[in-house]
Amino acid sequence: MVSTAKFPPLGERSANAGLPHLQYRSFPAAEANPALNDATLVVVMMEAVEALEHIEEIAAVEGVDIMPIGTNDLTTDWDIPGQYDDPRVAA
């Protein structure tokens, strides 16, 4: 996911001219990519039991910035949709 979101050398995202981050101006990639990477936030939603089982591995990935819990999908994956008072949700 990080490689898809970030520009070289941190990722593989293709750059194009006129991005809002650069006020729609064209810049050489050597200048633009570091600025674009700094402005790109990688958010990995934790919405499945399998994701929680691997949360430490996912958190260790260089470039992952935020990992919020998607309680709607998670409670559905636990077959308790919308039961936010379940002890597993609080944990």
Regions found by a protein language model. Name each.
Residues V2-A91:
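Expand to "…catalyze enediolate/carbanion chemistry for C-C bond making/breaking, isomerization
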